[in-house]
Amino acid sequence: MKFVLLFGVLLVTLFSYSSAEMLDDFDQADEDELLSLIEKEEARAKECTPRFYDCSHDRHSCCRSELFKDVCTCFYPEGGDNEVCTCQQPKHLKYMEKAADKAKKFGGKTKKWFG
């Protein structure tokens, strides 16, 4: 009986140690993957096209605003045959960002009142 109990304790100890090692390996892999994604995002962010600049060379290169990514909008100027593309923020997204800013400001005021 003592042998079975000792063997069980040894088995549980080895199992918990091996699972802890596997979790550490997974955590390390997740951290490495996250860091590589952040580096890629930073590199990509440097190449974005600012608002109201020409985006005809790459229509997916518009920069992000605070919450949303700007959209490459193309149009024909009055009296012209050439298409012009610029990065712009759609109006509905502009209004949503303004509402979010007001909600943040209001949230800060309520914290001061009820703090």
UniProtKB/Swiss-Prot annotation:
Gene Ontology MF terms in the entry: toxin activity
Q: Where in the cell is it found?
A: Secreted
Q: Which GO terms describe its cellular component?
A: extracellular region
Tissue specificity, in the record's words, reads: Expressed by the venom gland.
Do you know which Pfam families this protein is assigned to?
Answer: Toxin_35
- The protein's superkingdom reads Eukaryota
Q: What is known of its domains?
A: The presence of a 'disulfide through disulfide knot' structurally defines this protein as a knottin.
What name does the UniProt record give this protein? U3-lycotoxin-Ls1d
Lineage, broadest ranks: Eukaryota, Metazoa, Ecdysozoa, Arthropoda, Chelicerata
